[in-house]
Amino acid sequence: MLSVIICTYNRRKYIYNCLKSIAENDFDASKYEILVVNNNSTDDTEGECRRFGSDYPQINFSVCCETSQGLSYARNRGIEEAKGDILVYVDDDATVNREYLSTIAQFFDRYPDAMAAGGAIYPVYETEEPKWMSKYTRELITAYKDEGRRVIRMTGSRFPSGGNAAYRREIFDRVGRFDPALGRRGNLLISGEEKAVFYSMKRLDMPIYYLPSMILYHIIPQSKLTKQYFDNLTLSIGRSERLRTLSVSKAVFGKRLVAEGIKWIATIILGIGLTLRLSPEKAAKIFAFRRNVTRGLLGH
């Protein structure tokens, strides 16, 4: 059985369409459940969930409330409440394709070695994509992911986005739960909780795959395209990496600092290239990205 877990905080505008896209999948309703974990929403997210439950009575649908604020707390509550052996996390500001659930179910049946999987993520802008957006900042802002048209094992530093990921339940008994010190908390943009889980899995050589037909369409509002959001997000990425690596060891943190130096070299090369191609606004953004990540990594 699949358990589709949607952790939500103040997503009244998007949650109904998210749930609707799952319910309208070409998949037997008796083979999955949808579980919403409401993380102290103050808008009418709960009302939209009730509306969905009324409109789709055939769906095994439930809502629980996690009062400890934070995405990691909500995700961990989902593990506790879910009944399935495959746990699927879907972002609350997104929709999925009609083959989403069947793709996941068939994959885990065909790949008994697989312990987790993630899919493609395509942005859906509510306004135009800004001129400063490049392939280097698109993944950062929108969680864009496209690893090609084939099922592949994600090796090295590659891993799925936490908002479009499926896990065998048993992995959480082996690597532990999502770290509450990481992950979004209300409007705070700390992240990295799923990255910590995936790296723990890789240390145990637990296979993680990419599924091209597991598609999520991520809605990007204008509020995520502002300078304030960009600076807050990128600074939070650095802070998250500091927390994540120091929680493992000082040696791992030291390696991350060395990696940051290498990333600066790549950033300078990319920035020069973009400037020469007459895209100075794109170059400025990748420099701002690297600067903010470094500041967060150093504890600012």
Predicted feature locations:
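Short, well-formed alpha-helical segments that are part of the catalytic scaffolds
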Residues: 11-25
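A conserved acidic beta->alpha catalytic loop
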Residues: 21, 38-47, 94
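Glycine-rich, basic loop-to-helix element that forms the pyrophosphate-binding segment
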Residues: 66-82, 103
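Short aromatic/hydrophobic "clamp" motif used to bind/position activated sugar donors
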Residues: 87
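Conserved donor NDP-sugar-binding/catalytic core segment of glycosyltransferases
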Residues: 99-133
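Short, flexible, basic/aromatic active-site loop/helix in glycosyltransferases
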Residues: 136-158
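A short, conserved alpha-helix in the catalytic core of glycosyltransferases
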Residues: 162-167, 171-176, 181-214
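Non-catalytic, C-terminal membrane-associated alpha-helical segments of glycosyltransferases
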Residues: 232-240, 246-300
